[in-house]
A protein has these predicted regions:
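Active-site and substrate-binding clefts of carbohydrate-active enzymes
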Residues: 1-120
Length: 120
C-alpha cells in the first residue's frame, strides 16, 4: 500500500497534526537542511525538477521506461542527506563533489526524458 492509497482509504478519519516537532539525530530543528542560501537554492532546483517531471509524466509524451528512469533519479535527488552538505553549518571538505552529484541526479531526470539539460 502506498501513502496515497492509505490516505484515500483512511484520510477522513485521521487526526490533524497541529504541530510537527522538528527532530534529527543532529539537532532538534531543520537548520542543517534549510535556511542558508546554498540550501535554499538546492531546494529550488529540486522543486523545479519535480514540477517538470510531473508535467512530463502527465503529458503522455514519454514511454513508461523514460518515466520510470526519470522517477528513479528524482527519488535519489529527494534524499535529505544532500541538503546536509550545503551551507556553512556542515563541511565535508569536498562539498563541491556532493553539489555535483546532487545536480547530476537532477540533470539525469531531464536527460532520461530526452529533454535539454538545465543550466545549473
Amino acid at each position: 500500500i502506498t501513502p496515497s492509497d492509505y490516505l484515500k482509504m483512511y484520510g477522513d478519519s485521521l487526526d490533524t497534526i497541529d504541530e510537527l516537532y522538528p527532530s534529527s539525530w543532529f539537532q532538534p530543528n531543520f537548520a542543517t537542511w534549510i535556511g542558508e542560501t546554498d540550501e535554499n537554492e538546492a531546494w529550488d532546483l529540486l522543486y523545479q525538477t519535480r514540477i517538470d517531471f510531473e508535467e512530463a509524466k502527465k503529458s503522455g509524451d514519454y514511454s513508461d521506461e523514460q518515466i520510470n528512469q526519470a522517477y528513479e533519479y528524482m527519488l535519489l535527488a529527494e534524499g535529505s542527506d544532500w541538503f546536509w552538505w550545503y551551507g556553512l553549518d556542515q563541511d565535508s571538505t569536498v562539498d563541491y563533489y556532493f553539489d555535483q552529484a546532487f545536480k547530476d541526479l537532477l540533470r539525469m531526470v531531464y536527460l532520461s526524458l530526452g529533454l535539454d539539460e538545465p543550466g545549473f
